[in-house]
């Protein structure tokens, strides 16, 4: 019997932000990308107050300078990002940890609380060269789950950060089957989910259903959409992710899928503070394109939250 006087869990406090990705930034240094100072100026001008670090080395890596550059623009950092290949087992652990520790230290010094961990690509995201089998063996899945837990535990103990795993196109954690498998084989107290709505839709997943089923594992959101027509061409041609992005597979909301208002509505009742970071993959893109898109997207998301 339902008791009407039972207290309801508080609604999640959704903190909207953006990231270098939405300015066409994929690499620490690339002639096709805008400079880091322009990114910081424009993300603040677009009305965001939260950002991610993006690829290590794009923003200043000196903690004092990074804090100064972000603070004087009214910006705060929510997370850093690492790519990992933990399915390869113990042989890659030390090398992986050396990279993770470097990023985690800067992330902590920037005042952020999250480390976004993206699994390694099975094919090169620029050239399409196949690097590994598309499917992991049972042994590789065991290594992935076990070492992801070890990574999350060590990151928490040494840097005080929460690790959120980011399913990503052209990695071994992409489809609903693979995402659920990782969640079901890892400790929920250690390993949380960074749900990227665009990547999940790209790989055939339903973000709302995932939130409704695994909401207690949701630690972080990346908001983006895919263009269904472009995605159909990408799938028909089996294009790698990089060329797909160059063709515009990730599009400006609300022009694609999934609809973001139901995603936010599904996340709000979870009763946790949650970052919702806009990440519209646009590499490469004209330098004057990101700012107007960022303004419109922020206004759209704010309208969903105010509604």
Where do the PLM segments sit?
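C-terminal/domain-terminus segments
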Residues: 274-304
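Acidic/histidine-rich catalytic cores of soluble enzymes
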Residues: 18, 50-51, 145-257, 306
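Active-site acidic/histidine proton-transfer and metal-coordination neighborhood
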Residues: 2-8, 92-193, 289
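Short, flexible, mixed-charge acidic loops at enzyme active sites
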Residues: 30-34, 121-129, 230-243
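Acidic-and-aromatic substrate-binding clefts and catalytic sites of carbohydrate-active enzymes
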Residues: 27-32, 50-65, 85-96, 169-175, ...
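Non-cysteine beta-strand/loop elements that form the S-adenosyl-L-methionine
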Residues: 17-19, 78-80, 115-120, 216-227, ...
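A short, acidic, amphipathic alpha-helical segment used as a generic capping/interface helix at domain edges
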Residues: 254-270
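N-terminal pre-domain/capping segments
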Residues: 2-112, 138, 142, 149-150, ...
């Amino acid at each position: 019997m339902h008791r009407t006087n039972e207290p309801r869990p508080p609604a999640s406090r959704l903190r909207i932000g953006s990231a270098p990705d939405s300015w066409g930034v994929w690499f620490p240094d690339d002639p096709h990308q805008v400079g880091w100072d322009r990114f910081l100026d424009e993300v603040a001008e677009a009305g965001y107050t939260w950002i991610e670090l993006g690829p290590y080395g794009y923003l200043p890596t000196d903690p004092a300078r990074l804090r100064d550059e972000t603070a004087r623009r009214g910006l705060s950092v929510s997370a850093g990002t690492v790519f990992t290949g933990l399915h390869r087992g113990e042989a890659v652990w030390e090398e992986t940890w050396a990279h993770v520790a470097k990023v985690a230290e800067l992330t902590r010094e920037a005042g952020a609380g999250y480390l976004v961990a993206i699994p390694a690509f099975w094919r090169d995201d620029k050239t399409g060269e196949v690097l590994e089998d598309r499917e992991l063996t049972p042994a590789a899945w065991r290594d992935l789950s076990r070492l992801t837990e070890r990574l999350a535990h060590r990151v928490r103990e040494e840097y005080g950060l929460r690790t959120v795993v980011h399913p990503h196109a052209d990695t071994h954690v992409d489809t609903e089957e693979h995402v659920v498998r990782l969640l079901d084989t890892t400790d929920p107290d250690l390993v949380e989910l960074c749900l990227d709505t665009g990547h999940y839709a790209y790989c055939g997943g339903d973000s709302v259903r995932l939130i409704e089923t695994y909401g207690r594992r949701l630690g972080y959101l990346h908001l983006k959409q895919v263009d269904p027509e472009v995605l159909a061409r990408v799938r028909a041609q089996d294009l790698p992710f990089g060329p797909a992005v160059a063709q515009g597979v990730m599009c400006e909301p609300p022009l694609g899928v999934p609809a973001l208002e139901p995603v936010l509505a599904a996340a709000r009742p979870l009763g946790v503070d949650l970052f919702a970071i806009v990440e519209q993959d646009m590499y490469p893109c004209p330098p004057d394109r990101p700012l107007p898109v960022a303004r419109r997207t922020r206004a759209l998301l704010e309208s969903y939250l105010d509604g």
